[in-house]
Amino acid sequence: MTTGFLQKIFGSRNQRLVKQYQKTVAAINALEPQIEKLTDDQLRGKTDEFRQRIAAGESLDKLLPEAFAVCREASRRVLKMRHFDVQLIGGMVLHYGKIAEMRTGEGKTLVATLPVYLNALAGRGVHVVTVNDYLAQRDAEWMARLYNFLGLSVGINLSGMEHDQKQQAYAADITYGTNNEFGFDYLRDNMVYETDARVQRALNFAVVDEVDSILIDEARTPLIISGQAEDHTELYVRMNALPPLLERQIGEEKADGTGVEKPGDYTLDEKSRQVFLTESGHEKAERLLAEWGLIGEGESLYAPQNITLMHHVYAALRAHTLFHKDQHYVVQNGEVVIVDEFTGRLMAGRRWSDGLHQAVEAKEHVKIQSENQTLASITFQNYFRMYAKLAGMTGTADTEAYEFNEIYGLETVVIPTNRPPKRIDKQDQIYKTAKERYDAVIRDIRECYERGQPVLVGTTSIENSELLSHLLTQAGLPHEVLNAKQHEREAAIVAEAGRPKRITIATNMAGRGTDIVLGGNAEKQAAFLEADDSIPPDEKARRIKQLHDEWETLHEQVKAAGGLHIIGTERHESRRIDNQLRGRAGRQGDPGSSRFYLSLDDPLLRIFAGDRVRSIMDRLKMPEGEAIEAGIVTRSIESAQRKVEARNFDIRKQLLEYDDVSNDQRKVIYQQRNELLEAHDITETISAMRHGVITEVVHQFVPAGSIEEQWDVPELEEVLRNDWQLDLAIQEMVNESSSITAEEILEAVTSAADEQYEAKVAMVGRESFSAFERSVMLQTVDRLWREHLAALDHLRQGIHLRGYAQKNPKQEYKREAFELFAAMLDAIKQEVTRIVMNVQVQSPEQLEEAAEQIEEQGGHLENVEFQHADYAESGAPVANVAVAAAATADMVGSAMTHGGAGGEMPKVGRNDPCPCGSGKKYKQCHGKLS
């Protein structure tokens, strides 16, 4: 109450910020008359002047009014568009590292030019991030005219570009690209073997378009670079036969044994998207698997040797019960392609993790792609937090303002519209069944069609859009369908969705980023005419004028009919997605309207609010086909949406807390890697490693401060000879001296190791040996980091079970992840020392060849894929991540000869028998983490 009273007096934080920025707007406007008088060359010359002033120490904040005034004037001359005052405010919000919420049609693309121009003057690079390649290319080509006029270079970073093209794109003052591509480039840069193979510069300033889509909707979906792992194709096919033989249990058993309406083999929790086998389901699955020869007679699925099978059983069950064709995925060209649940777009190249994608492929009888091992991964949350300054813009951010602030430290500022909005948002209409709802939607569309009003219908899935399309065809209403299957045509369809009598069905926010102009998009048609050289100039000018005249007539006609009418056929889990759909109407003060038609069969209502609304309808004795339209019901639905939003926020926050652990470790490894790449000589690093490892080996058999009776000298001699190529007569030293200490033995072994090392260096030269050491170290770091990522994935998969032991899973994860990381660092030291001490050197040429071979094997991994894999959608616990497969083979081995034996050192996998002949697995013997 007190807060509301103070806000009335002083205004909200948002109002105060906007008022503060309006003072700067006045200063920019005051500069306009003198800037207008400048010639094109003088205006362009301002860029060099600003750069000199920045070099002399002037801050960007102080330059802001002049730079914005110059950018606005350049835009007026080049693009024939002058920034409105509210757009200047939006530009300031972005420059100060905040999120600007601007309504659809308010010119976000143009707003971005102001802070991008100002920050590019510093010469440290600016990244403009969009959601897809089409928007990146469109915006870059459109705005490059302005930036080039002002003397700035523009690059476009697209997937599939050549390495040299990418380096040029990043070297430009301003780089446009997609969130995926920027993230993958960061990961790839940390897998290279030469400094000049990197493409990115330091992460300076990023402006993220559709910031809610990238930083919130996709925050649960890490970017993963993966390589091929073990093949379980046959097992997925066998397991696919299991789910159809199991029946779903209806109802949940309570403590008193009641609650089960119909017994079955598994339960389905739609709210948390989980599936669980019941007791009878386990028994039935075990019996069937035994019949198929996959487990022994009477064996349990929980037996250690059957844990992998358990994983496949659940993957198959989830594929059959939780993931549906044309809703969660489509089958295209013999491949299962994920449909993004937020945008309805096809996510080509993205795969579900944890074996789920392979299980869906088996279900759809298409070719099963091999499982992958994670080579590198990062979430958008952690990638974008690395930028020195981050800003974003969207039409709908205010509902998620708390999350932006909590996770990214970004404040959201709602920018006033240039003209007052005229859109009318009508009350939701709720029907008992989906059939009644669709009948009402068709009636509404027909009424709009008859009065010449364009309609945009939003659906939540491809399945629903195709059903509605079928109903419209039956009703004889011409329409366009815009879903993930027509990805290429979406911009063209959206551009014309504002023409009279036009009916467009869109899956969620497909076509986002393209304005719907009332009367159609005359500019696009005029651009086609301009580009056609076969038309004479006079004829071209006449046709373009005719186009604009026709558009004026159509524009007024549509405005008179009520503007664009938005129909939502379902409420989304997030209010923000609903607001995005509504926001397509009423751009720049145009008239418009919106209404949502719901049914009690909708997932959101069924799961969260169905019983309450159904009881209201029953009490009111609503006849069939009659809708309930009341504020209390709409509020009940919004309350359900808030619950889902809060749950999704908790999921993202929890994922971030887990990912922060691996992120801290990633930073350490990548920093070490970069130091290695940039160092000319790593002799000191190798020397410190060698001394550390030798000390550990000696102390294992001759403990520090111990007496002679506790020593195992013969075993020490054997280990030094076999593993480290050091042939020392330590037993003789002990026999000859009555007072020798453990420290003296350590000193003797260390000296021998140093002498052996120096002899190798002397044979080939410091430079050649240093290059070899760098290659070995980089390859070892990369290989063990990959194994470590796999170990972390395994750890995270089961860590939630620690809660049953009254332990905090997050704390347990942090503790064990740290122990694994420390063990990995030890393993790096051991492995590098072992290779360097075992290598037999004959000539510098041979050493260079070995180094090149190591780099080639490490840098050119086979079957590398770039995935944007959705962990959270796999239906696994929140703590779960993709299970990476077994460790890769030792790639260093084939690049050098083994000391003593003179032949090739064998490749040893972690699960292979140890070459020392102990009979143990390599990972439990000489490959063991110490």
UniProtKB/Swiss-Prot annotation:
- Annotated cofactor note: May bind 1 zinc ion per subunit.
Q: Which residues bind ATP?
A: 87, 105-109, 515
A Pfam family reported for this protein in Swiss-Prot or TrEMBL: SecA_PP_bind
Kindly list the places in or outside the cell where this protein is found, as annotated in its UniProt entry: Cell inner membrane; Cytoplasm
Give the matching SUPFAM superfamilies.
Helical scaffold and wing domains of SecA, P-loop containing nucleoside triphosphate hydrolases, Pre-protein crosslinking domain of SecA
Q: Major location, coarse class? A: membrane
Molecular-function GO terms, alphabetical: ATP binding; metal ion binding; protein-exporting ATPase activity
Assembly notes = Monomer and homodimer. Part of the essential Sec protein translocation apparatus which comprises SecA, SecYEG and auxiliary proteins SecDF-YajC and YidC.
Its protein name is Protein translocase subunit SecA
State the organism named in the record.
Burkholderia vietnamiensis (strain G4 / LMG 22486)
